[in-house]
Structure formats: C-alpha cells, structure tokens
C-alpha cells in the first residue's frame, strides 16, 4: 500500500456555485483524506507562478485571469495512490470526454471552467503542495 499526497484546487467556477462541500464529500468517499485546506484569492503573481509551465501558450493569460476571478480552495489530499485516484475522480480536462460520474462530468461548465485541478504526478504534487503550504500546515490523520 503506497500512501501518498496529491494537490487539488477547487476552481473559481465551482466555488461560486457552492460546490466545495459536494466535491469534498466525493473526495472523502474514495477513502482519501483532506489533510490541509485553505481558501485563497490568487494574486496575478501567484497564478502566473503556479501555471508557469504554460507561459507562452495561447491560453495562459485567460487561465491566469480565470484563476484570479474569484476565491479558490487549495487542498492536500492523502491516501493510497492519491495522485492517480484523484485524477480518475476528476475525469478528463474536457468535461465532454470525462467519464460519467467524474467531478468534471458532473460539475464542469466547459473545458475552460472545468471546476477542479489535480497534480499530474507525484513530483508535480510535491511542487504544488509546497507552493501553497508549509509542512506544518499539513495535518496527517490516522487511518481507522
């Protein structure tokens, strides 16, 4: 059993539609635990820094503006194979291609307003977690 951490964002469109609780319930239903969470309003510098790998791409400016358009929830998830399991729960980036019952199939408005973000690898998860959380802000919970 490989217990790992992953990083997740509930994006502005989902926060605006009061979907935080519904998304958290779905995460916890999979057996993963939310071990850190906070609500933020991203600055331009934070959004650009977080999505720096996309700088220069045609969608970069729109993505940054979208992520600054309202509050987001950032959280650290922990569980067995958390990166892969959370990506499966999210579904494909394009909600029209996302599996029925996935977060994006159920909650996304469009490919641009796709409600959630998740790290794509354990390495990305570690980098993204460190971008928003100090280690002492993460509170592992015992598995019962």
Swiss-Prot record:
<feature type="active site" description="Pros-phosphohistidine intermediate">
    <location>
        <position position="117"/>
    </location>
</feature>
<feature type="binding site">
    <location>
        <position position="93"/>
    </location>
    <ligand>
        <name>ATP</name>
    </ligand>
</feature>
<feature type="binding site">
    <location>
        <position position="114"/>
    </location>
    <ligand>
        <name>ATP</name>
    </ligand>
</feature>
<keyword id="KW-0547">Nucleotide-binding</keyword>
<keyword id="KW-0418">Kinase</keyword>
<comment type="function">
    <text>Major role in the synthesis of nucleoside triphosphates other than ATP. The ATP gamma phosphate is transferred to the NDP beta phosphate via a ping-pong mechanism, using a phosphorylated active-site intermediate.</text>
</comment>
<comment type="similarity">
    <text>Belongs to the NDK family.</text>
</comment>
<keyword id="KW-0067">ATP-binding</keyword>
<dbReference type="GO" id="GO:0006241">
    <property type="term" value="P:CTP biosynthetic process"/>
</dbReference>
<protein>
    <recommendedName>
        <fullName>Nucleoside diphosphate kinase</fullName>
        <ecNumber>2.7.4.6</ecNumber>
    </recommendedName>
</protein>
<feature type="binding site">
    <location>
        <position position="87"/>
    </location>
    <ligand>
        <name>ATP</name>
    </ligand>
</feature>
<keyword id="KW-0808">Transferase</keyword>
<dbReference type="InterPro" id="IPR001564">
    <property type="entry name" value="Nucleoside_diP_kinase"/>
</dbReference>
<keyword id="KW-0597">Phosphoprotein</keyword>
<dbReference type="InterPro" id="IPR034907">
    <property type="entry name" value="NDK-like_dom"/>
</dbReference>
<keyword id="KW-0963">Cytoplasm</keyword>
<dbReference type="GO" id="GO:0004550">
    <property type="term" value="F:nucleoside diphosphate kinase activity"/>
</dbReference>
<dbReference type="Pfam" id="PF00334">
    <property type="entry name" value="NDK"/>
</dbReference>
<keyword id="KW-0479">Metal-binding</keyword>
<feature type="binding site">
    <location>
        <position position="11"/>
    </location>
    <ligand>
        <name>ATP</name>
    </ligand>
</feature>
<feature type="binding site">
    <location>
        <position position="104"/>
    </location>
    <ligand>
        <name>ATP</name>
    </ligand>
</feature>
<dbReference type="GO" id="GO:0005737">
    <property type="term" value="C:cytoplasm"/>
</dbReference>
<keyword id="KW-0460">Magnesium</keyword>
<dbReference type="InterPro" id="IPR036850">
    <property type="entry name" value="NDK-like_dom_sf"/>
</dbReference>
<dbReference type="GO" id="GO:0005524">
    <property type="term" value="F:ATP binding"/>
</dbReference>
<comment type="subunit">
    <text>Homotetramer.</text>
</comment>
<dbReference type="GO" id="GO:0006228">
    <property type="term" value="P:UTP biosynthetic process"/>
</dbReference>
<keyword id="KW-0546">Nucleotide metabolism</keyword>
<dbReference type="GO" id="GO:0006183">
    <property type="term" value="P:GTP biosynthetic process"/>
</dbReference>
<feature type="binding site">
    <location>
        <position position="59"/>
    </location>
    <ligand>
        <name>ATP</name>
    </ligand>
</feature>
<dbReference type="GO" id="GO:0046872">
    <property type="term" value="F:metal ion binding"/>
</dbReference>
């Amino acid at each position: 059993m490989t217990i790992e951490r992953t990083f997740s964002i509930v994006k502005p469109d989902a926060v605006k539609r009061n979907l935080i609780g519904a998304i958290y319930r779905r995460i916890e239903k999979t057996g993963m635990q939310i071990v850190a969470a906070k609500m933020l309003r991203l600055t331009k510098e934070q959004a650009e820094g977080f999505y720096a790998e996309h700088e220069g791409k045609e969608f970069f400016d729109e993505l940054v503006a979208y992520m600054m358009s309202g509050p987001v929830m950032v959280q650290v998830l922990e569980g067995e194979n958390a990166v892969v399991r959370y990506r499966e729960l999210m579904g494909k980036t394009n909600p029209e291609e996302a599996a029925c019952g996935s977060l994006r199939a159920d909650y996304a408005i469009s490919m641009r307003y796709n409600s959630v973000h998740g790290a794509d690898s354990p390495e990305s998860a570690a980098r993204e977690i460190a971008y928003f959380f100090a280690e002492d802000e993460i509170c592992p919970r015992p598995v019962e």
